[in-house]
C-alpha cells in the first residue's frame, strides 16, 4: 500500500504540483532490508509494541524466532557448500529441507529435471534471504497471515499476505484464516 508523502509540518508533499505517494506498511520495511548491513534483523511494527510488563514474553519469542532462523541458515549454508561447483549427491535430502523447513513446494517439473538442473534449482532456493514469522491464532483482527502463493516456476511458497493483497473474490480466505502474523526475523 502507498501513503501520501508529507513535509516535516505534516502538510502533503507535492512534486511538480502533484501529490507524491510513497511505499508504506510491511512491504516498505521489507524493501528497506536490502539496505541494512546485518546478519539478523527483527522487524517489529506498532502492532507488536507491548508494555514493559509483557516484554519478557516478547524477548522469549524473539529468541525462539532468531534461533530457528539461524538453524535454518546454518543448514542452508551447509547444502550450498556441499553443492558449490558440483552436482548434489543428496538432492532428495536437500529438496526435503526446502519443502519441509523452508515451506517451498517444488514444481511438478522438478522430478524430471537432470541432476545438474536439480542442483541449480535447489541452490537458487537456498541462496536467498530466509524469513521466519511468528503467528498467533486469528481472532478476527485485521491484517495479514500465512498463505500459499503460486510462483511463476510452478512451485508454491508460504508467504505473509496482507489483506490489501487479496483479490476481492478471495476475501473469504482471509476471513477463514486460522492464524495471524505477530513478528518477523530475517537473515
Where are the regions that the model predicts?
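Acidic, two-metal ion nucleic-acid-processing modules in DNA metabolism proteins
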Residues: 146
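Domain-scale recognition of functional cores that engage charged ligands
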Residues: 1-139, 149, 153-156, 165
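Conserved small/polar residues in nucleotide/adenosyl-binding loops
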Residues: 185-187
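A general secondary-structure signal for short beta-strands and their flanking turns/coil
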Residues: 129, 142, 180-182
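Short nucleic-acid-contacting surface segments enriched for D/E, G, S/T with interspersed K/R
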Residues: 172-183
Amino acid at each position: 500500500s502507498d501513503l501520501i508523502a508529507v513535509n516535516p509540518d505534516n502538510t502533503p508533499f507535492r512534486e511538480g504540483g502533484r501529490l507524491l505517494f510513497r511505499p508504506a506498511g510491511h512491504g516498505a520495511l521489507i524493501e528497506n532490508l536490502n539496505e541494512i548491513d546485518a546478519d539478523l534483523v527483527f522487524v517489529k511494527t506498532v502492532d507488536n509494541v507491548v508494555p514493559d510488563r509483557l516484554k519478557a514474553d516478547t524477548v522469549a519469542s524473539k529468541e525462539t524466532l532468531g534461533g530457528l532462523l539461524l538453524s535454518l541458515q546454518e543448514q542452508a549454508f551447509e547444502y550450498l557448500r556441499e553443492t558449490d561447483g558440483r552436482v548434489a549427491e543428496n538432492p532428495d535430502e536437500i529438496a526435503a529441507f526446502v519443502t519441509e523447513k523452508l515451506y517451498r513446494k517444488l514444481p511438478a517439473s522438478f522430478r524430471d529435471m537432470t541432476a545438474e538442473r536439480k542442483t541449480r534449482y535447489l541452490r537458487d532456493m537456498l541462496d536467498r534471504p530466509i524469513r521466519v514469522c511468528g503467528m498467533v491464532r486469528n481472532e478476527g483482527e485485521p491484517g495479514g497471515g500465512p498463505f500459499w502463493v503460486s510462483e511463476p516456476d510452478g512451485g508454491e511458497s508460504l508467504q505473509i499476505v496482507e489483506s490489501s493483497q487479496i483479490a476481492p473474490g478471495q476475501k473469504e480466505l482471509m476471513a477463514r484464516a486460522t492464524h495471524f502474523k505477530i513478528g518477523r526475523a530475517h537473515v
